[in-house]
């Protein structure tokens, strides 16, 4: 049985669930799930856990995510991207300088309370926000606490003198639950003009990046050589200190027992026969199991 993480390079025009469905069919596997939904028109890194790795999904969500994208000043939509209905337009007669845009981005960096777009999957009273929007039902959107670690302008903005709009490229590193579309919209609000996100690519998630991402077509063509496209469970815990278990220790760990270890780390990955078999956390003078991965081979 396959165990690990497939870093899928999701194309534009398909949902994250579509990718999981297709990969399930390709691999003929039941235990499968993704970590971090991408909107249909967003491409890039979509980590999909299979087998024992599905135990990691909650932890995978906790790691930062990175994006590159583009936006435009002069237009705003109800969805904050090009899929939505235009709700505001304004000619940009005097384009913003790089320094002005950077100053706006800096105000949107750090710990923020963010209002999600009305066209999003956030639930309010058991119903998704986009369902309220489609039915024209007013709803108060709940603020969410997010952390924007960095929001950077990646090159000088470009001004279109005919359309009187200004385009800009950005890079963002943020916590889970952050809506990048909202950050583009909010940047426009900081500068006093309408703004819309025009493209977005996720470049990293759950500790994996685009260099490790593969197309579903490649997986299907190379299904007999999983070493080319499957990230082992151990790779997810690369930052954790690892301890080798003796046969006697492994027997105790296999039974979920607490054990004494000759280390002082708060959390450790326990290795046996070359694979991580459990994650243990220190409590006082002993270590107790936090996650069991006994079938990780």
Curated annotation (Swiss-Prot):
Single annotated GO MF: RNA binding
Gene Ontology biological process: mRNA pseudouridine synthesis; tRNA pseudouridine synthesis
Residue intervals passing through the bilayer: none
Active site residues according to the UniProt entry: 39
Enzyme Commission number: 5.4.99.25
Keywords assigned: Isomerase, tRNA processing
Reaction(s) the record says it catalyses: uridine(55) in tRNA = pseudouridine(55) in tRNA
Coiled-coil boundaries: none
Tree of life domain: Bacteria
Keyword Transferase set for record: no
Record-linked InterPro entries: PsdUridine_synth_cat_dom_sf, PsdUridine_synth_N, tRNA_psdUridine_synth_TruB, TruB_C
HAMAP family tied to this protein: TruB_bact (MF_01080)
Its job: Responsible for synthesis of pseudouridine from uracil-55 in the psi GC loop of transfer RNAs.
Alphabetical list of NCBIfam families matching this protein: TruB
Assigned protein family: Belongs to the pseudouridine synthase TruB family. Type 1 subfamily.
Protein name, entry field: tRNA pseudouridine synthase B
Record organism: Lactobacillus gasseri (strain ATCC 33323 / DSM 20243 / BCRC 14619 / CIP 102991 / JCM 1131 / KCTC 3163 / NCIMB 11718 / NCTC 13722 / AM63)
């Amino acid at each position: 049985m396959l165990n690990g993480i497939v870093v899928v390079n999701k194309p534009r025009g398909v949902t994250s669930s579509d990718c999981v469905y297709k990969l399930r069919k390709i691999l003929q596997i039941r235990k499968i799930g993704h970590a971090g939904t991408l909107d249909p028109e967003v491409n890039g890194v979509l980590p999909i856990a299979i087998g024992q790795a599905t135990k990691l999904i909650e932890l995978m969500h906790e790691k930062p995510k990175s994006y590159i994208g583009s936006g435009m000043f002069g237009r705003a939509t109800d969805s904050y991207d090009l899929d939505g209905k235009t709700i505001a337009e304004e000619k940009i007669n005097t384009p913003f300088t790089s320094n002005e845009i950077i100053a706006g981005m800096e105000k949107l960096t750090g710990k923020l309370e963010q209002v999600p777009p009305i066209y999003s999957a956030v639930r309010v009273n058991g119903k998704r926000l986009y369902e309220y929007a489609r039915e024209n039902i007013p709803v108060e959107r709940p603020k969410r606490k997010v952390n924007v670690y960095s929001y950077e302008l990646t090159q000088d903005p470009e001004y279109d003198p005919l359309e009187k709009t200004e385009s800009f490229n950005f890079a963002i590193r943020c916590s889970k639950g952050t809506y990048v579309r909202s950050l583009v919209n909010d940047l426009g609000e900081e500068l006093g003009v309408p703004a819309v996100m025009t493209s977005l690519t996720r470049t990293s998630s759950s500790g994996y990046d685009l260099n490790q991402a593969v197309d579903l077509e490649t997986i299907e063509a190379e299904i007999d050589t999983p070493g080319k496209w499957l990230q082992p469970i151990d790779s997810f815990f690369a930052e954790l200190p690892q301890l080798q278990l003796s046969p006697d220790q492994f027997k105790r760990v296999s039974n979920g027992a607490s054990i004494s270890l000759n280390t002082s780390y708060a959390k450790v990955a326990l290795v046996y026969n070359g694979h991580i078999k459990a994650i243990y956390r220190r409590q006082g003078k002993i270590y107790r199991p936090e996650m069991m991965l006994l079938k990780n081979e």
